[in-house]
Structures are given as structure tokens and as C-alpha cells.
């Protein structure tokens, strides 16, 4: 049976736009966002989509139409939010290395809040705000030293990580921020990692942060919001992912009677399973020790398998009644690490379409031009309709900034 995205068969999309091709389901995006709104309804959260997961303008625009706020980590991401019609007043500026130019851009745009991550950043935002004659609304990202139990590259809440202000130093950092005339402290933030499959670290982080909220209140620093970041995982293979309803109930119980607005910053859990990467088999190569299915997608299109040894389910779009083989599914890039799946049993042959699932997050957003390969096109499907939301890059576009310098 042929695979479909909503009501559109994948072969139709391949014929119209070629491969490799990122394909997103609009209904899946909507359902994921509304799942957060429903689960946390009692707390009336501001759900801020983490743009780093997938910064396509049409995806940002769709979330904006649903009432989403946005979590950004660069001036470029802010520019994307604004270009797509997102609301700066519902945008949180996170990130460990904000430049003065980025801070100025964000202040002039009117972002809701800066999540500050160090004493030098506090001083820098004060300096820029004073120069502009503005007041910057700020919170501090506090590192609660909680083990997120995830891949070390995407764990962000331990003492050894570069993110946030150490828990033991947080009170003093808040005192320092409170002395700055052009800063208005409105919140506290934590984010302990990505692709979390266990609820307990999220709850533990919330508990530790609320202890700090109370200590700050005792010193007269009363906060308006609690930002718990993102991190909730999705199913790539057979993971047990946290139940949002249970998470919401735990957070509500912990907040209790405190008058705190809740902010959440999901990324992967909004877009990850809404997208897939469509690719075509170039060759099937049989070897003495290993077989290989060579496809036209590669690590420059989807970096996660090579970077994290991440698993993505891969299946034939139009299954055939032929003998399956066990093989590594690999791209044409000149790296041994250019693989999309290892030791997969699949029935396919030259020219067949394969679908790489759960590629909506950290797929296109991490793509590159390695080996001078053009970045893939992207398509958004809505029912039986579909539209191109990113044209396939051309070699002329890829070389434009260099040709001008010859």
C-alpha cells in the first residue's frame, strides 16, 4: 500500500518536486500545538515554539496563526519570526552569546523577554538598553544541575554544560540584575535538555526552580513568570515519552498558589513527527560483509544520524513483493559517517522511494552544503492540497556570495 501524507500520496510529491524532499503535515503541526494548550489549559500557558527546531517561514507563520509565541536564540531567528508575521511581544530571546547588535535588534523589535545566561550578558544588555534609552524585560536562565537522562550533546542542565547560571550563583546574579537601572526582572527560566523521555527530571527541575522563586520573593524580587523551557521527547523508535497531561498536573501542583504565568518552549515535540524526508534509491550495493542502499539524501540533509547516532524509521513508500535485504542506508557524501540508518531490513531496488520518518525537527534546520550539495526543497501538505514552502537550492544560489568576490 502506497504511503500518504494526509491525503496526498508521496509519489505525487516526488514527481512534482523531486527528491530529496522534506514533507510536513499541517494537521500534525496543529494537533501537536493544541495538545500543549489542552494539557496545560488550567495554567493558561504561553506556548513559545522553539524556532531552532525548524525555522521555515511557513511553519512559523502557521504557529503564529494558532496564537503561538516563539523562543529564539539569534537575531536571524528573530528576523524569521518577524518576516513570518510572528509577534515580537510574545517572543523570548534565549541563547548564551547574544551580540550587542542582536540585543539592539531585539529591543527595537519589542521582544517580550531576554533569558540571560551570565553576569557578562546582564551587563551587556544593561549597556545596550541604556544607550537606546529603553528598559529591557529580563529573566535569568538558571542551571538546576538536573540530569536530563538524554544524549550528552543535547543535555543542557548540568554543571558541566555551558548553559545558564549555576544554581548556587543564581541569587547573587538576580541581585546584580536588580541593581541595573535599565533592566526589569520579570521571570526565571530553565531548560535541562532535549528529547527527554522521562518525566522525573522535568519535575525535579521545576521543584528546584520554585525554591529559588520563593527565596527571591523573600528578598523583594517578585517574578511574573516561570519558563520551564522545552525538552519533551517524541517517538523515533520505541521510546516511552512523557505524558503531557501528567506533566501539566505535576507543574500545577508544584506552582500551587504562586501567581506565576507559565511559559513553555517546545520545539521537537511540535514539529518532529510532523515531518519526513523523502528520498530515492540510486543503487543497491551488495558486499561481502555489508550491503548498502545508496539514496539521494545524505548527512547534509539530515545530520542527526551521523551527529547523534540517532534512529529514524525508514520504510518503502510503495512496498514491493521482492526479497528484502539487510543493509546500511547511506548517502553519496564522501564520509563513512554519511548514513541515515544502519542494519535495516527493507525490500527496495533502484528508483524506489523511501521515507525517513520523524524528520521535522533538526532536519532542514541543520542542513548544509557539504560536498557542494544543494539544500532540499520543502513542502507543506494540508488535506489533499500541498504547496512548496522552500524551493530547492540551485548551484547558482549556493555560489552567489563567492562568485561576486572572484
UniProtKB/Swiss-Prot annotation:
Modified residues (N6-(pyridoxal phosphate)lysine): 52
EC top class named in words: lyase
GO biological process: lysine biosynthetic process via diaminopimelate
Coiled coil ranges: none
PROSITE patterns per UniProt: ODR_DC_2_2
Binding residues annotated for pyridoxal 5'-phosphate, in chain numbering: 231, 265-268, 362
EC number: 4.1.1.20
Quaternary organization: Homodimer.
Stated role: Specifically catalyzes the decarboxylation of meso-diaminopimelate (meso-DAP) to L-lysine.
Protein family per UniProt: Belongs to the Orn/Lys/Arg decarboxylase class-II family. LysA subfamily.
Name under which the protein is recorded: Diaminopimelate decarboxylase
Organism: Neisseria meningitidis serogroup A / serotype 4A (strain DSM 15465 / Z2491)
Encoding gene per record: lysA
Amino acid at each position: 500500500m502506497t504511503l500518504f501524507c494526509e491525503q496526498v500520496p508521496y509519489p505525487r510529491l516526488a514527481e512534482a518536486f523531486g527528491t530529496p524532499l522534506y514533507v510536513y503535515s499541517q494537521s500534525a503541526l496543529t494537533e501537536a500545538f493544541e495538545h500543549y494548550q489542552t494539557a496545560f489549559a488550567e495554567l493558561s500557558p504561553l506556548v513559545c515554539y522553539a524556532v531552532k527546531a525548524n525555522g521555515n517561514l511557513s511553519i512559523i507563520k502557521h504557529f503564529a496563526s494558532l496564537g503561538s509565541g516563539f523562543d529564539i536564540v539569534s537575531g536571524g531567528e528573530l528576523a524569521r519570526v518577524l518576516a513570518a508575521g510572528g509577534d515580537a511581544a510574545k517572543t523570548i530571546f534565549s541563547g548564551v552569546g547574544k551580540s550587542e547588535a542582536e540585543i539592539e535588534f531585539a529591543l527595537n523589535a519589542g521582544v517580550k523577554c531576554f533569558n540571560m545566561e551570565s553576569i557578562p550578558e546582564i551587563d551587556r544588555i544593561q549597556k545596550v538598553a541604556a544607550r537606546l534609552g529603553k528598559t529591557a524585560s529580563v529573566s535569568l536562565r538558571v542551571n538546576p544541575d538536573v540530569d536530563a537522562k538524554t544524549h550528552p550533546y543535547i543535555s543542557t542542565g548540568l554543571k558541566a554544560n555551558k548553559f545558564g547560571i549555576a544554581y548556587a550563583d543564581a541569587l547573587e546574579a538576580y541581585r546584580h540584575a536588580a541593581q541595573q537601572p535599565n533592566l526589569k526582572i520579570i521571570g526565571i527560566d530553565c531548560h535541562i535538555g532535549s528529547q527527554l523521555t522521562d518525566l522525573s527530571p522535568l519535575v525535579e527541575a521545576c521543584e528546584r526552580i520554585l525554591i529559588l522563586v520563593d527565596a527571591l520573593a523573600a528578598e523583594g524580587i517578585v517574578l511574573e513568570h516561570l519558563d520551564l523551557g522545552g525538552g519533551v521527547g517524541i517517538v523515533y523508535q520505541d521510546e516511552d515519552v512523557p505524558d503531557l497531561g501528567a506533566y501539566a498536573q505535576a507543574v500545577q501542583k508544584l506552582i500551587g498558589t504562586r501567581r506565576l504565568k507559565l511559559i513553555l518552549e517546545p520545539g521537537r515535540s511540535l514539529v518532529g513527527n510532523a515531518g519526513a524526508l523523502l528520498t530515492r534509491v540510486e543503487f543497491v550495493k551488495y558486499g561481502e560483509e555489508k550491503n548498502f542502499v545508496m539514496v539521494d539524501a545524505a548527512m547534509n540533509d539530515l545530520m542527526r544520524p551521523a551527529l547523534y547516532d540517532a534512529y529514524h524509521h525508514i520504510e518503502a513508500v510503495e512496498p514491493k513483493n521482492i526479497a528484502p535485504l539487510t543493509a546500511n542506508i547511506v548517502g553519496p557524501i564522501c564520509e563513512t559517517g554519511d548514513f541515515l540508518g544502519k542494519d535495516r531490513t527493507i525490500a527496495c531496488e533502484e528508483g524506489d522511494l523511501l521515507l525517513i520518518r520523524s524528520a521535522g525537527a533538526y532536519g532542514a534546520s541543520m542542513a548544509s552544503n557539504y560536498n557542494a550539495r544543494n539544500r532540499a526543497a520543502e513542502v507543506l501538505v494540508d488535506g489533499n492540497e500541498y504547496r512548496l514552502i522552500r524551493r530547492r537550492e540551485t548551484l547558482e544560489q549556493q555560489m552567489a556570495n563567492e562568485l561576486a568576490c572572484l
